[in-house]
Amino acid sequence: MKARLLILLCALSATDADTICIGYHANNSTDTVDTVLEKNVTVTHSVNLLEDSHNGKLCRLKGIAPLQLGKCNIAGWILGNPECESLLSNRSWSYIAETPNSENGICYPGDFADYEELREQLSSVSSFERFEIFPKESSWPKHNITRGVTVACSHAKKSSFYKNLLWLTEANGLYPSLSKSYVNDREKEVLVLWGVHHPSNIEDQRTLYRKENAYVSVVSSNYNRRFTPEIAERPKVRGQPGRMNYYWTLLEPGDKIIFEANGNLIAPWYAFALSRGPGSGIITSNASMDECDTKCQTPQGAINSSLPFQNIHPVTIGECPKYVRSTKLRMVTGLRNIPSIQSRGLFGAIAGFIEGGWTGMVDGWYGYHHQNEQGSGYAADQKSTQNAINGITNKVNSVIEKMNTQFTAVGKEFNKLEKRMENLNKKVDDGFLDIWTYNAELLVLLENERTLDFHDSNVKNLYEKVKNQLRNNAKEIGNGCFEFYHKCDNECMESVKNGTYDYPKYSEESKLNRAKIDGVKLESMGVYQILAIYSTVASSLVLLVSLGAISFWMCSNGSLQCRICI
C-alpha cells in the first residue's frame, strides 16, 4: 500500500517537462474599433481615417493668400462700394472669404439681378484684370460724370458712388441719347456690370435726365434686354426713396456688347477679364486670417491632413478629405488586444483556443514561448508577422487611396424666392451625404472584421505548423501549448520555430517516455480504485458505529424503547 501511495505522489508532482507555446502580441493600447459583429473591440494597433481637428484660422492655400472681404460682401466688392475700395487692388487669390453679416454691399438700395448666379461664377475665378471698359473722361463728353454721387454711398463723410460704375446725369440742361459698344479682345471672359436708376417721382426724373420717358438697352450675342424706369413712391432705405437695379453679363472673347440709352443708365466704368482656377471658391466664415499655409480650407478653419474623411464641415476648398457625418472611423491594423491574465496562464481567447496575448513579445505579432532546462523566452515568428504587416499595409493604403478623392465642395447659392429649390437641394445633398457616410462606415466595419479574422487564421496556421512537425513526440496541453515527450534544448526549440524539427531523431526517446507516462497513469488508476474502496468501507463503519452509540444512549435514558419479540 505504501508503495502504491508513493507512486501516486510521484504522479501528482508533475515533472518540469519542456514546453513550447504559440501565441500573439499584446500591449497597453486602448484603441478600439468596430466590426460588423462587435463594437468597441480593443486592438493593439489601428489607424484613424477621420479627421476631426482644424486650426480655427483662414490660411494661405498652397502659398496663395485668400481674398478676405472683411466688412464687405461680394456685391460691395464687385460693384466697388466706396467702403470696399481697398479690395480692388487684389488681382489674384486662392479663395474668397466672406463674413456672415457683412455690412457693406449694395449702398444705393435696389436689387442685384441673378446675384446668386454671379457668386457661383466668381467662386471659380482665381484672378482677374480690372480695366476701364469705357474711360471716364473720354467716353461721355455730352453727359455729366461728376454729379452722380449720393450720401447712401458716402465715404469719409463725403457723398460718393461705386468705383466701378458711373451715374450719368444731364449736362447743360440736356441728356442726349447715347450709344456705346465694346468688343472683347482679351481672349478671356469679361464681366460687365451696369445699372438702371428708378426715381421715386417724376420731378427727380426730369431733373436728372430731362425727360419723363426713358429707356436703357443692352445687347450682346447672348444677352438682349430693354429696361424702362419704374417711377413710383417708395419707402426710404438708407435715406433714399429711389432705387437702382444692378445687372451683369459675361462677354465671350470676340463678342460685342452695345449700350443704348436716353436716360437712367448707370454706365460701366471698369470691367473684369476673368481667369478661372479649379481650386478656388467662396466660403462664409468668421475665422480670422493667420500666417499659415494649408491644402484644405473650411469655414471652421484649415485642415492639414492626408486622411480620406473629415467631419468638420461640408464646405471645403482645396485638396480636402470627403465630409461624412461619422464620429469615428478607425481601421484595425493589429490584433485583438487581450493581455493574458496570469492566474489563467499565458493566454486568453483569440483563434478560439488561446486565451490572451503576450506583452513580453514585442518584436512581432505572432510567435512562440518556450521553456526547458536552459531557461525560457519569447520569440516572434518574423516571416508570418512580416507577411501580415505587408498585406494589411497594402490594404490600408489601397482603401485610403480609393476613398481619398480630395476636392473642393462649395455651397450652392439660392435667392430668397428660390426657397423650395434650396430645400430640395438640401434634401438631395443630405441624401448623398448619408450614402457617403454609410459607405465609409460599412467599408471600415467589413475591413476590420476581415483583418481580425486574418490574424486569427495566422495564429491557427502557426499552431498547425508546430503540431504537424511534432506529431506524437509531444502532446497538446491546451492554451496553444505542447509538452514534449523528450528533452528539447534551445537548438531543438529553434528547429521547431524555423520548421526544421527532426522528428525521427527524437521519436525513440519520445516513445519510451510516452510508455512510462502511460504506465504511471495505469498504476495511478489502480491506486485510485483501492483508495476509493478503502474510503467507502471506512466511511460505512464510522456511520454504523455512530448510529449504535446514539441508539445505546437513547435506550439508557428512556428516550428509546427496544422490544424483542420471539
From Swiss-Prot:
Pfam short name (any one)? Hemagglutinin
Those parts of the protein on the Extracellular side are 18-529
Q: Where in the cell is it found?
A: Virion membrane; Host apical cell membrane
**Alphabetical list of Gene3D superfamilies matching this protein:** 3.90.20.10, 3.90.209.20, Hemagglutinin Chain A, Domain 2
Against InterPro entries, the record matches this protein to:
Capsid_hemagglutn, Hemagglutn_HA1_a/b_dom_sf, Hemagglutn_influenz_A, Hemagglutn_influenz_A/B
This protein's source sits in the domain of life called: Viruses
Instruction: Provide the GO biological process annotations.
Output: clathrin-dependent endocytosis of virus by host cell; fusion of virus membrane with host endosome membrane; fusion of virus membrane with host plasma membrane; viral budding from plasma membrane; virion attachment to host cell
Keywords attached to this Swiss-Prot or TrEMBL record, sorted alphabetically, are: Clathrin- and caveolin-independent endocytosis of virus by host, Clathrin-mediated endocytosis of virus by host, Disulfide bond, Fusion of virus membrane with host endosomal membrane, Fusion of virus membrane with host membrane, Glycoprotein, Hemagglutinin, Host cell membrane, Host membrane, Host-virus interaction, Lipoprotein, Membrane, Palmitate, Signal, Transmembrane, Transmembrane helix, Viral attachment to host cell, Viral envelope protein, Viral penetration into host cytoplasm, Virion, Virus endocytosis by host, Virus entry into host cell
Q: Which residues are glycosylated?
A: N27, N28, N40, N90, N144, N286, N304, N498
Q: Would you indicate the residue range of the signal peptide?
A: 1-17
| Its membrane topology | Single-pass type I membrane protein
Q: Where is this site: Cleavage?
A: R344, G345
Lipid-attached positions, S-palmitoyl cysteine = C555, C562, C565
Q: How is the quaternary structure described?
A: Homotrimer of disulfide-linked HA1-HA2. Interacts with human CACNA1C.
What the protein does comes down to: Binds to sialic acid-containing receptors on the cell surface, bringing about the attachment of the virus particle to the cell. This attachment induces virion internalization either through clathrin-dependent endocytosis or through clathrin- and caveolin-independent pathway. Plays a major role in the determination of host range restriction and virulence. Class I viral fusion protein. Responsible for penetration of the virus into the cell cytoplasm by mediating the fusion of the membrane of the endocytosed virus particle with the endosomal membrane.
Other information: Major glycoprotein, comprises over 80% of the envelope proteins present in virus particle.
Q: Which family does it belong to?
A: Belongs to the influenza viruses hemagglutinin family.
Q: Which named protein is this?
A: Hemagglutinin
Identify the species of origin: Influenza A virus (strain A/Malaysia:Malaya/302/1954 H1N1)
